[in-house]
Swiss-Prot record:
Mutant lacking the gene: phenotype: Cells grow better in the presence of the bile acid deoxycholate. Increased membrane stability when incubated for 2 hours in the presence of 4.5% deoxycholate. Increased cell survival in the presence of 20% deoxycholate.
Organism: Escherichia coli (strain K12)
GO CC annotation: ATP-binding cassette (ABC) transporter complex; outer membrane-bounded periplasmic space
CDD domains: PBP2_OppA
Pfam families on file: SBP_bac_5 (PF00496)
Name of the protein in its database record: Probable deoxycholate-binding periplasmic protein YgiS
Biological classification of the source: Bacteria, Pseudomonadati, Pseudomonadota, Gammaproteobacteria, Enterobacterales
Length: 535
């Protein structure tokens, strides 16, 4: 067993092409290798174990590196690990780190740095928003540690020497190596944390093991990173600098793109028809494992009443929002997007009915709950500051006022304070977006489990939890999908959230940017793969 796995994996790694900034022969490069990226807003953190959203993850993917990375086709490739063995029927992994790995300050990176990072993730003292991620990966004792029932040192990960990391799972997880590409499972510098403790993640203290290091952070304007000469593959990293711009308005991003000040930006909805005509070679529409929805807070009335939640769920014109208000989106009826591997979406007949019938159903539910024209439903709709999110919020509030007579107040915040408010439960109905951290429906559905850190609405359903727990025991994708479909039916019936649309990657990319991934549905962009052609 050991020999067969080892030989297969050695062959896999040795056959893997050299991906880092694979510049085609005879391609002239620009003298200034700087990539300027519209990243929407400032990240909430750059601490790998505390990352919870793509805004931060995009930067952390450049500053740090895990055991593996995801190539432009969405396939797992060796990163800090040069190879690995899968043993005991998929319950034990042995990762062999590359020789000579260093942190950006020149200190050696060892397997113990991975152990520390993973232990930090599950340690309740860290308060990682992704602590449950290791439990979802079924790493031994992770769930017990997160629940405060076991010590962090009992986590199923250990360094058998400086270059060898052994991971023990409670059960086989077919997509386990894919999960390793998310920042929660990145290493952290043991020597820096020993010196600075929780302050290690302040910019003046941080060190990095990724292709870039933090150079400058102008709050709410931009973050600049420069090439890391200590990176394991620095000789193949072409970019010298990356700028992550905090442009929270798609029109501003578009205007700066047209002015030549941004190389990659999101597309404003109202400009899509014109862009398709004027810049067809620069508009990129890439399938993406993303779901946009609104979360109810079940700890606050009126949304502790399923009848009220269902009334709002039924009266959303998803087609209008996805294709008219925003454009190029797909109306969502399930939390899990149809692009997820092996998932077949469930069709709900009630959402296929004419809006007039759905409104009648919704009004009946509200009447049962005690709401009518003399006592209208009142609530607050909460979203983070961004013009496209505002368009969606306005459309939703208008629909609910039109169909149900609801009085909806809009509330918006900057990204960081928005995240803090959601975590504190300071909302009634709030916007949420989820991008898969691995290609399986459980990446989406697990966010609603009773013990999930992402379940900010505090919905609890024992039947739902049992279905997902049962699904983790099944390796057959078809049988697992049947359980996922049952879970989606419960979401439809209980409405802890309202699916709105599925969003592909819709961006403008300058034609002189080379190496950009066009087929990775998880939207992992590694700047080490990019280069700027002469233009």
């Amino acid at each position: 067993m050991y020999t067969r796995n080892l030989l297969w994996l050695v062959s896999l790694v040795s056959a893997a092409p050299l991906y880092a900034a694979d510049v085609p022969a005879n391609t002239p490069l620009a003298p200034q290798q700087v990539f300027r990226y519209n990243n929407h807003s400032d990240p909430g953190t750059l601490d790998p174990q505390k990352v919870e959203e793509n805004t931060a993850a995009q930067i952390v993917l450049d500053l740090f590196e895990g055991l593996v990375w995801m190539d432009g086709e969405g396939q797992v490739q060796p990163a800090q690990a040069e190879r690995w063995e899968i043993l005991d029927g998929g319950k034990r992994y042995i990762f062999h780190l590359r020789s000579g790995l260093q942190w950006s300050d020149g200190q050696p990176l060892t397997a113990e740095d991975f152990v520390l990072g993973w232990q930090r993730a599950v340690d309740p003292k860290t308060a990682s928003p992704f602590a449950g991620y290791l439990a979802q990966a079924h790493i031994n004792n992770a769930a017990a540690i997160v629940a405060g029932k076991a010590d962090v040192t009992s986590l199923g990960v250990k360094a058998t020497d400086d270059r060898t990391l052994e991971v023990t799972l409670e059960q086989p997880v077919p997509w386990f190596t894919t999960m390793l590409a998310w920042p929660t499972l990145f290493p952290v510098p043991h020597h820096v944390i020993a010196k600075h403790g929780d302050s290690w993640s302040k910019p003046e203290n941080m060190v990095y093991n990724g292709a870039f290091v933090l150079d400058q952070w102008v709050v709410n304007e931009k973050i600049t990173a420069r090439k890391n000469p200590k990176y394991r593959d620095a000789q193949h990293t072409v970019l010298q600098q990356v700028e992550y711009l905090a442009l929270d308005n798609s029109v501003t991003g578009y205007n700066r793109y047209r002015a030549g000040e941004v190389d990659l930006t999101w597309v404003p909805a109202q400009q899509i028809p014109a862009i398709e005509k004027s810049l067809p070679g620069e508009l990129r529409i890439i399938p993406r494992l993303n779901s946009e929805y609104y979360n109810f807070n079940l700890e606050k009335p009126p949304f502790n009443d399923v009848r009220v939640r269902r009334a709002l769920y039924l009266t959303v014109d998803r087609q209008l929002i996805a294709q008219k208000v925003l454009g190029l989106r797909t109306p969502a009826t399930t939390l899990t997007p149809p692009e997820v591997k092996g998932f077949s979406a469930t069709t709900f007949d009630e959402l296929q009915k004419p809006m007039s019938e759905r409104v009648a159903m919704a009004k009946a539910l509200l009447k049962q709950a005690g709401y009518d024209a003399s006592h209208p439903l009142r609530f607050e709709l909460f979203y983070n500051k961004y013009d496209l999110h505002e368009k969606t919020a306005i459309a939703l509030s208008s629909e609910w006022k039109k169909w149900l007579g609801a009085q909806v107040t809009l509330r918006t915040m900057e990204w960081k304070t928005y995240l803090d408010a959601r975590r504190a439960g300071d909302f009634m109905l709030s916007r949420q977006s989820w991008d898969a951290t691995y290609n399986d429906a459980s990446s989406f559905l697990n966010t609603l489990k009773s013990d999930s850190e992402e379940n900010v609405g505090h919905w609890k359903n024992a039947q739902y939890d049992a279905l997902l727990n049962q699904a983790t025991q099944i390796t057959d994708a078809t049988k697992r999908n049947a359980l996922y479909q049952q879970a989606e039916v419960i979401i439809n019936q209980q409405a802890p959230l309202i699916p709105i649309y599925y969003q592909p990657l819709i961006k403008l990319l300058k034609p002189y940017v080379g190496g950009f991934p066009l087929h990775n549905p998880q939207d992992y962009v590694y700047s080490k793969e990019l280069y700027i052609k002469a233009h």
